[in-house]
Amino acid sequence: MMERAMEYRVTLMEAMISTVNPNFIKLKENLGRLGKIRRYFASYCQYSSRYDKFKEGVILNAFNPKLSNGSVMDIGIYTIYPMVALFGMPDSIQAEGVLLSNGFDGQGAVNFKYDQLDMTATVLYSKIANSFLPSEIEGEDGTMMIDQIHIAQNVDFIPRIPTGQGQSQKAVRESLGSPLDKSPYYYEIKEFIDLIQEGKQISSINSWDTSLDTLRVIDEIRRQLGIAYEADVCELTSKL
């Protein structure tokens, strides 16, 4: 698709709502306040309304591996794409997950290591269980807390209390964003329209490089978990 977009000089952008969200952009602008970043943690676990049918033996589209829409592809990407957008490609990946009876990946937990950044990352995703955990970016000087990584209605900065002042001072949570007054998809569509009107092929936010690197990460997760789709044109054998 990227080759064809270049050939025909058309605009191509991944439809990722998370990173064009104004609150996520605000988070990115304030990352420096965290000091040395030590960990990225993101969770998106949502019990699918179609899972009950699956347990009854009825395979609907949301749990059909023929459609290449397993848990990591469907909702796990919302935890991984922002990580790659902020920190780039990890140096190592260790994935664990649950495969359902038809080979469909129901959920996963993945640990990442960034050697040059001296930080780690962990993501959780599921279509077969709920979680209500917020997501965080943890630094030596403070923590960013994101209520929902995929739509980021609220982003808070919580500074670290200096050593020795824990009894006399309390950390004051600062809201960096505000509840969205428009659908999260509005900002995705606006970014795409702006690119077309400005004659640009590639978004600086949802860039081609970020999309490719995210797919490389997901391919490695799939390789480790043994997730294969009929649409795969080659076996997933490469490692990072």
Predicted regions and their residues:
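Contiguous beta-strand/loop segments that form the cofactor/metal-binding neighborhood of enzyme cores
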Residues: 80-154, 190-199, 234-240
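A general structural signal for well-ordered alpha-helical segments in protein cores
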Residues: 24, 79-80, 154-155, 186-193, ...
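Active-site loop of classical SDR/Rossmann-like NAD(P)-dependent oxidoreductases
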Residues: 176-190, 206
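Hydrophobic residues in well-ordered beta-strands that form the structural core
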Residues: 12-14, 146
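Rossmann-fold NAD(P)-binding glycine/threonine-rich loop
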Residues: 1-11
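Predominantly a Rossmann-like dinucleotide-binding segment in NAD(P)-dependent oxidoreductases
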Residues: 18-93
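C-terminal helix-rich "cap/oligomerization" subdomain common to oxidoreductases
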Residues: 7, 116, 191-240
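Short aromatic-enriched loop/helix-cap "lid" or pocket-rim segments at secondary-structure transitions
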Residues: 24-26, 50-55, 106-107, 135, ...
